Structure formats: C-alpha cells, structure tokens
C-alpha cells in the first residue's frame, strides 16, 4: 500500500484504548479526560479494519494504547489479528505492569514480540515520572518476558534532570540480557513540548566514552529487529544491543512505513489525522 508520498505502508499500529494505569508526566499526566466508552472501537471493528489493511499490503500490526493490557480480552484481539490472512507479525507495546499475569495468554494467542517502557532503574524516580508505585510490577513483567523467550525491547525516554544520570546503566542492561534497549528522543508535542530533549547523537557520544568499542551494528544484522527508524549499536561480547530513535534530530519521515489507527477509529499518518 502506497501513500500520497509513494511510501510503502505495511505496518499498522492499533491504539486499542485511551486508558492507562500510569500518569507519565510527558504523556498522560493526572487530569487527562478519558473517552466515553461508546467512542472507542470494539475488537470486532478493529479486526474488520485490520483485515482491510491486510488486503492492501499491511503485514505487521502493533497493539498499543494508552496501555493495551488494561483493556479486557486483548489476548483475544491478538489471536484474531494472527488469524487474518497476510498478517505475519503481531507485536505489542506495554508499560509492563500487567504483563507477567497476562503473558501466558498472550503467548498462547501468538504474540510475536513485546516492547516495554522503562525510563529508570530507580523506584523513586519511576514514581516521580509516572505518579504510581508500580516499578516492581514492571520489572516482574520484564523478567517474565525474558524468561519466556519472546523477543523483548525496552523503550526509554531520556529526560533532563530526571533520568539523565542513569542512561548508561539502562544501556548496560543489554550487556548480559538478549534484548534491545532503545532511547527515544522526547517529542516536542503535547506535554513533552515543554521538556528539553537529550539528543540521540549526544547519547551516542556519551556511550562511546563509556564503552570505547561501542559501534553500529551491520545493517543486515539490525534488520532482524524490524524495519523501523531505530539505529542499533552494540559492544563486542554483549548479549543485546542499544538502539536510538532520533524522533527530533533524525530524518526518517521519507522512509516511514506505518500508520496508526486510534481508539476512536481515526487514521493517523505522521501528525496528520484522517
């Protein structure tokens, strides 16, 4: 499926709910109004639309939110997506709080991989970012995912004055674990617009000073992590890798291959809504 800019779109993000059980300062702080229940698409409607996208060439679906695991029966949605002809991969982005308890059902449904948000390794910083005391449950979810063997990526948003002093420690999680730790630049939109950005190039320089052998992965090797905007680096001997998504300083719009379907059924291409 090609858009008006002749980009090949084959990746669909489904925002299955606007609800979340965290209140991250840059995403959904306290006071954000939730949608009326009848305004949110049913799973049947999501599956019907996903099937139409598959007929147009979409082969990968990512289930997101809000927090997708707060919506009951999301494993049934995953199973339904996996049954659609042409859909070869179904993945999920989650904050991890409910992951440990729901992972068996998700694996049985055919979930192919999971991305888990983790901005800090310190419980008190986690609570300051999210306004919730859920750090232990997130780490439990990460451990459960790693133990299950499902491919795991950790997503971290570097934040000035919040977690900038522990970014090397977060990157080092990839040293002894078979996962990708990805650093995503703060987007200057919504609540993040008032927050300064720590750039991907700045982080790469920091990590190269910490680990002199820190170097980019060959394109053929990093291709196995998906065809998104992340650029991957590693250190010889590490079990995992470190990725950078330069949402501000990068220039990857021309090669974008994805669209988002919001929980209300709006189609989002970049920052445009249809």
Across the structure, where does each feature detected by a protein language model lie?
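Short, small-residue-enriched loops and turns at beta-alpha junctions
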Residues: 16, 35, 67-71, 159-162, ...
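A C-terminal junction/extension of Radical SAM enzymes
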Residues: 167, 173-176, 180-263
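Short cysteine clusters
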Residues: 20, 24-27, 253-256, 270
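Canonical Radical SAM [4Fe-4S] cluster-binding loop centered on the CxxxCxxC motif
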Residues: 4-44
